[in-house]
Amino acid sequence: MKFGAQVGVYRNTWDEISGVATVMDKGRWDSIWFADHFLPPPGRPEEEHLTAHEAFTVLSAVAGITSRLRMGHLVLGNTYRNPGLVAKMASTVDHISHGRFVLGIGAAWFKREHEAYGWEFPSMKERQDRFEEACALIRGLFVADEPVNFKGNYYVLDNAPLSPASFQGPHIPILVGGTGEQRTLRTLARYGDIMNLDGWAGGPMTAEYFQHKVGVLTKHCEDWGRDPSEITKTVLMPALVSDDADEVEAFLKGRRLGEGTAAGPKNYVIDRIGALIEAGAQEVMIGGISTMTPDNFQFIDEEVLSAFD
């Protein structure tokens, strides 16, 4: 069983991020993940001035100070960067990390940061269309042994090489963010390598909910003639380990979190994670860790992750 953590790139400092990454690299953690936002979500006007580091830059720096952790984003917003550029950045950081990079990408949802920085924010349908096309383009570059030509409705490649190619073989894995049943999981079945059920999105995060989403993915894989076992099933679960009922309530209310969150005493959090593992989750990423200190991540390592040794 593998465990990761989503480490915040906003409301904190680089020294805090690097300290946490260093401790994680020495512990039980298998992976480190970063959100991709240019303003701190969920978009409160009074918080827009707070720190929000650019996520790919942070990850590149973390690659240089760690030696073991796999790393990626949960998830990059497709509308922020040209997908050809994303593929190039991905292959570069895969070499910096000696093959530890995972490309996590989604259609993007945060309208306010598009407005703030002058990026177009298309309709949901167009964002899904663009996202599917971007996944096709990126995968095409990842798997090709020669320059790639691609002509879509939104993106074009003209005899474009990907050099350096992926450091890891057979190629950098693609994590498709989101579990929308009609479009996103279908895109994952065709172009992705990793599914991630996102507790931030408001689902109940029960074993039954997880298995339902896997069932939908399996049907899409059948439609494309793909073996669903080729796709790794993962979960992002916001969590807080605390015996203090007031702290738990404040955590849930302050972040507007619901059923997708495991907040409570240690054994409750362990049981919630264990149920997802029994349902077939192959990796659990813990998100929403409110205290960005090495000691807190070490505490979760020793008190929660150790239960699954």
Where are these regions (language model features)?
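Active-site-adjacent structural elements that line small-molecule/cofactor binding pockets in enzymes
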Residues: M1-D309
